[in-house]
Amino acid sequence: MTEQKVRKELKTDMPSIYSFELHEMKEWLKEQDEKPFRAAQIFEWLYEKRVTSFDAMSNLSKELREKLKAQFAITTLKTVIKQTSQDGTIKFLFELHDGYTIETVLMRHEYGNSVCVTTQVGCRIGCTFCASTLGGLKRNLEAGEIVAQVLKVQQALDETDERVSSVVIMGIGEPFDNFEEMLAFLKIINHDNGLNIGARHITVSTSGIIPKIYQFADEQMQINFAVSLHAPNTEIRSRLMPINKAYKLPKLMEAIEYYIQKTGRRVSFEYGLFGGVNDQVHHAEELADLLKGIKCHVNLIPVNYVPERDYVRTPREQIFLFEKTLKERGVNVTIRREQGHDIDAACGQLRAKERQEETR
């Protein structure tokens, strides 16, 4: 039995079949005295035909279907809330088997449909501007529960003959704090027999867990990599992101340079603009100095208002000035397009709102 299979079987008595990679399914079939080629058939039913019952897998023997039913669950998510924005963004609040809720967002772009997935129930990182960390971390998601989010959104898109064209792992939780499950998820959605989403159409983001950045670099995946930076120096970053006290900014930059050297890929830096905190011209100049010589791109993010937090949005004129200052210093930068502004679009907001209503 492989290490990964042990990892999954420790999670629950009935692991999600979506948590298994193709080679793991082949190994399981061998253990059951079944032909390994059946794995591709099972994956076709799961990811192309998107059935939610083993009984629907009509080209498998009844005996094999019974074995599958006895050992695996097909993870299903219950839609608790579905909010649709005027710009087409859809935010889902899904309920898991144990009653916990998670958020998933469908964002519509000119180039296709992007899904933002959650990797944890809650978050332990404690960023002082984020609604996701309110209430702390409850548990990690299994790879199958992350896969199920993409499939649930894809099922909604099937009604209009559309498909999920890209995935971003920027929802609730710190992906690198759930590293093994996140990695399995990446491999499943990228695989030809899985959801077949190209590596260049997948983005994973981290707040800066340095040891995992090195580990991720060594995987040498051609997946887009983003780092939540949000500050040009240690003092401001420690105020915004307590993780900076454990993983210092200079060491984080060293890890990022290792990633670039190892993969040949550029890094995206997420930089949320908070009024009067990190959005002045001198902050932009300091940020340009920090990133000098690094193969990177900066996404400036006009932050969504979170009622439980004290930060305010940077005025639009100041955002443009910040962008202009970076460009003048040779930094590749764009302002992220705002989506879902008329719904509970900030990460963790919908879940937090639902929890508040439950406690009234």
Swiss-Prot record:
GO molecular function terms noted in the UniProt entry: 4 iron, 4 sulfur cluster binding; metal ion binding; rRNA (adenine(2503)-C2-)-methyltransferase activity; rRNA binding; tRNA (adenine(37)-C2)-methyltransferase activity; tRNA binding
Entry coiled-coil feature ranges: none
Gene Ontology biological-process entries: rRNA base methylation; tRNA methylation
Chain sites annotated for binding S-adenosyl-L-methionine: G173, E174, S205, S228, L229, H230, N304
The protein's required cofactors: [4Fe-4S] cluster
Gene3D superfamilies xrefs: 1.10.150.530, Aldolase class I
Pfam assignment, any one: Radical_SAM
Catalysed reaction, written as an equation: adenosine(2503) in 23S rRNA + 2 reduced [2Fe-2S]-[ferredoxin] + 2 S-adenosyl-L-methionine = 2-methyladenosine(2503) in 23S rRNA + 5'-deoxyadenosine + L-methionine + 2 oxidized [2Fe-2S]-[ferredoxin] + S-adenosyl-L-homocysteine; adenosine(37) in tRNA + 2 reduced [2Fe-2S]-[ferredoxin] + 2 S-adenosyl-L-methionine = 2-methyladenosine(37) in tRNA + 5'-deoxyadenosine + L-methionine + 2 oxidized [2Fe-2S]-[ferredoxin] + S-adenosyl-L-homocysteine
Keywords annotated in UniProt: 4Fe-4S, Cytoplasm, Disulfide bond, Iron, Iron-sulfur, Metal-binding, Methyltransferase, rRNA processing, S-adenosyl-L-methionine, Transferase, tRNA processing
Domain Radical SAM core residue range list: 109-342
Location(s), subcellular: Cytoplasm
Binding-site residues, [4Fe-4S] cluster: C123, C127, C130
The EC number(s) this enzyme carries: 2.1.1.192
Active site (catalytic residues): E103, C347
Disulfide bonds: C116-C347
Record flagged with keyword Methyltransferase: yes
Annotated GO CC locations: cytoplasm
Spans traversing the lipid bilayer: none
PROSITE patterns, per the entry: RADICAL_SAM
Note: Reaction proceeds by a ping-pong mechanism involving intermediate methylation of a conserved cysteine residue.
Job description of the protein: Specifically methylates position 2 of adenine 2503 in 23S rRNA and position 2 of adenine 37 in tRNAs.
HAMAP family referenced in this protein's UniProt entry, alphabetically: RNA_methyltr_RlmN
Protein family membership: Belongs to the radical SAM superfamily. RlmN family.
Protein's name in the database: Probable dual-specificity RNA methyltransferase RlmN
Species, as recorded: Bacillus pumilus (strain SAFR-032)
